[in-house]
């Protein structure tokens, strides 16, 4: 099967320099949603038609299974499909999709393909309560005879509620023949793809239809308002699927998934959470309110407290993270690790049962098991040019307000006194302290303000 995706629309109503089909829906370009659905149908050829000023489309979305053709000037949907003709295999049907209609399911498209077979013209239609603006499906004795656009429709035709979604499948050899016959003698001065219906009827080719499972599958995007509406529909669908899987959502209307979220049993997600990229939550994970989790894995029974931010992190089982914690790329936490409020961890491995509960930065570090990192501790990993690593072995106690100047190693069982600035390796099982001697000044008086 050939699949052609029309993605050349200028999108003037989007009020943006970005091509319309590259605007994100759930964190992914509209066109990418359509391409992903098309791939589920295993096409032999997949061609994207892009338009003037849309060179970003092939630049951003190039892949081995994609080919691209440019439509310039843009003279309608029929003209757009003409640009793909040299790339189409005559011996298999051609399915035509739209890059700004992102929510059509593979199941609905397969229903259309099954209806059309290899020798019929198939059209995906839908019945609308208010069909204004859409091309109407004109039937005679139940059979589709043509599609008439809104601007060209007669009053009686405007009363028709069955509309053309634009999605259709046709025998490719016949499609090429019908495209060659198209005329732009209409109100818009464009080559309408819908005019091939009349050609099919004239050739005695049966014109059949199928309908999607849901009306929203055919909704397109022409403005930021419509984009926002589709975002809510898409997020509602994701939330519904999570609920069906047994995930507890405090409010299904207040979760955003911008990628793939995989959940185990008895997962609980509070309001305002955003999941980006590939995120995996194991059994019993609890995510509190307003967390952002990007490309991360969280182990069983771990608890993420409010306002925490993860990016490319791996969290083990039974960890407690946050509130207000930040796990940056390269963070790997073993089981039962506690990362508390206003603690940032970057490119570091922290072994089991270790804790950094308050106001701490751990960067480019390897931390052993059962380590306690006191409040205000900083691993000083950057000298202005190079980044160096800090190694803290098992059973270390780091006192509050300690600075560890990397590269440095703290031996097993060592204790660092509060306020220490560590510039040399600390030996195992010993107390290391580095700070000025405390003094008390007698008869000390605070300065007084001088009146001017």
Curated annotation (Swiss-Prot):
One BP term from GO: UDP-N-acetylglucosamine biosynthetic process
Cofactor dependency: Mg(2+)
Lineage of the species this protein comes from: Bacteria, Pseudomonadati, Pseudomonadota, Betaproteobacteria, Burkholderiales
Catalytic residues (UniProt): 358 (proton acceptor)
One matching Pfam family: Hexapep
Cross-referenced PANTHER family: BIFUNCTIONAL PROTEIN GLMU, NUCLEOTIDYL TRANSFERASE
Chemical reaction(s) catalysed: alpha-D-glucosamine 1-phosphate + acetyl-CoA = N-acetyl-alpha-D-glucosamine 1-phosphate + CoA + H(+); N-acetyl-alpha-D-glucosamine 1-phosphate + UTP + H(+) = UDP-N-acetyl-alpha-D-glucosamine + diphosphate
Organism: Janthinobacterium sp. (strain Marseille) (Minibacterium massiliensis)
EC number(s) on file: 2.7.7.23, 2.3.1.157
Region spans: Linker: 225-245
Entry's family note: In the N-terminal section; belongs to the N-acetylglucosamine-1-phosphate uridyltransferase family. In the C-terminal section; belongs to the transferase hexapeptide repeat family.
Positions with a binding annotation for Mg(2+): 100, 222
Pathway: Nucleotide-sugar biosynthesis; UDP-N-acetyl-alpha-D-glucosamine biosynthesis; N-acetyl-alpha-D-glucosamine 1-phosphate from alpha-D-glucosamine 6-phosphate (route II): step 2/2; Nucleotide-sugar biosynthesis; UDP-N-acetyl-alpha-D-glucosamine biosynthesis; UDP-N-acetyl-alpha-D-glucosamine from N-acetyl-alpha-D-glucosamine 1-phosphate: step 1/1; Bacterial outer membrane biogenesis; LPS lipid A biosynthesis
Role of this protein: Catalyzes the last two sequential reactions in the de novo biosynthetic pathway for UDP-N-acetylglucosamine (UDP-GlcNAc). The C-terminal domain catalyzes the transfer of acetyl group from acetyl coenzyme A to glucosamine-1-phosphate (GlcN-1-P) to produce N-acetylglucosamine-1-phosphate (GlcNAc-1-P), which is converted into UDP-GlcNAc by the transfer of uridine 5-monophosphate (from uridine 5-triphosphate), a reaction catalyzed by the N-terminal domain.
Protein name: Bifunctional protein GlmU
Cofactor note: Binds 1 Mg(2+) ion per subunit.
GO cellular component terms listed in the entry, alphabetical order: cytoplasm; membrane
Ligand binding (acetyl-CoA): 375, 381-382, 400, 418, 435
Region (Pyrophosphorylase): 1-224
Top enzyme category: transferase
Region (N-acetyltransferase): 246-452
Coiled-coil annotated residue ranges, if any: none
Compartments where found: Cytoplasm
